[in-house]
Amino acid sequence: MNGDRAGGGRPLALITGASSGIGYELARLFAEHGHDLVVNAEDERLEHAARRLRETGVEVRAVRADLRTAEGVDRLVAALTGLTVDVAALNAGVGQGGAFVDTDPRDDQSVIDLNVSSTVRLAKPLLRDMVARGVGRLMFTSSVAATMPGSFQSVYNASKSFVQSFAQALQKEVADTGVTVTSFMPGPTETDFFRRAGMTDTKVGTMDKDDPAQIARQAYDAVMKGRGKLVTGSAKTKAQGVADKVLPDRVKAAVHRRMAEPGSATEDGAAAGDGAATEDGGR
């Protein structure tokens, strides 16, 4: 990092979890506003996404790497060597549904590795470089889940609480450096998140969800204005964000349980199973 610009001097944006959902929509917005891109995801859809993004006329580098692993994080950091990253959107995440006593410990660890560990490991070199240059924008995909105890999504909600606290702490640390840190908090979003997290039999998994393009637009506007944090999405999601500030944790936990309990979408309570799945900006 802290080197040349590609594409004739255009600013460069890094987006993780960019193969679909909010991450892809963020990448599209940055491209349409004249940013070259480095896009990352761990799945095969990344190359297709990169081809579509190149149609905007900017330079797009696709780095396929699994950020749940130290090797994947190192691969992405190495790909940034010699580049000046003007905006970094740390968006990749993984979701998991089910009772904590029933979920696979490996899935629990996968949530922690991607949502927490990779976020910290990537933020360090990116923020160091931005502070050294006295300019830059760092953004985190948090979640409204960060504001409530997540019964039947316990590790996931806790991981998003970490991201939110981490982002707000960094905001104050770099307040006088010329660097801004933004965290945005989407609610349930129309992506593969709930299907891949084994939550299609839950109330939250079957309810109407927000448009990832709308969320990305609000997040893009916020980071370019240097805002600290915001709840993104529909009026309903934003109202939830307001309510979460005043409701007791026990009430929020009870509501979350009713929405996320396996089988809650059906009268007979038949469960579709647990699982962890790559989010790429789902919720």
Located regions from the model:
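Substrate-binding pocket helix/loop in short-chain dehydrogenase/reductase
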Residues: A99-V101, D107-I112
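Rossmann-fold cofactor-recognition segment
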Residues: R54-E71
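Conserved glycine-rich Rossmann-like NAD(P)H-binding loop of the short-chain dehydrogenase/reductase
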Residues: H33-H48
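Conserved glycine-rich cofactor-binding loop
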Residues: S19-S20
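Active-site helix of classical SDR
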Residues: A123, S159
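C-terminal helical subdomain
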Residues: S183, K203-Q240, D274
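Residue(s) in the substrate-gating loop at a strand-loop-helix junction
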Residues: S143
